[in-house]
Amino acid sequence: MKEKVEKLAIFDLDDTIYDGNSHFALLNHYYNTCIFTSIFMKVIGKICPSFHMKICYWAYNRIPQNIRRNFVLPYRQRIIKLMNEKRHEGYHLVIVSNAPEDLLQAASRRLNVLAVRAEFGKKSKVVKERYCYQKVFVCTDNKTDIDLLQLSDEAVITCKRGNREYFLKRLKGKNYQFIDEGDEI
């Protein structure tokens, strides 16, 4: 049964709420390396994304669960402020992310916000299945969230200036604004 909310505010986790990608940051931290965010791994991710993710999940699943459940990154304070504004405006807040479940729930507990996991490109499907809403706000950095952004009445996109064109071409007629990565109030 769908949850009925008048106003829904959807936030992505990695590189949106968090100042970084929690999955890769935990891998680098735990294994005391930078290999998981290296150029080499980025190339593997572009050439063979499924193999790249298999490697990452293989390494991730070997990290003790208590470490995975408690790992958090620094928050982007501008987004935390935006979350508080949306809460004050009466929005029902939810984090929708494809981050590993342990990392997603760690953020959920610390921020006192419901978190829902969705596969790449499936966030809008998960939202439509779970919620009935009148108005939706989306905050993300992901190019793969275009379908979610197209559902929105209002959006904030956190990205590098060089990536704006991608969103501009696909979101004609939408009410959105950009926050440049690294910008803080």
Predicted regions and their residues:
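Sequence-level detector for tyrosine residue identity
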Residues: Y18, F24, Y30-Y31, H52, ...
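Active-site neighborhood of HAD-like aspartate-dependent phosphohydrolases
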Residues: M1-I55
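C-terminal cap/substrate-recognition subdomain and adjoining C-terminal extension
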Residues: M1-L8, F71-I185
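Exposed alpha-helical structural elements
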Residues: S22-L26, I39, V43, K54-A59, ...
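N-terminal leader/targeting helix
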Residues: D15, R62-R78
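Short, basic/glycine-rich phosphate-binding loops at helix/coil junctions
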Residues: S50-I67, A107-L111
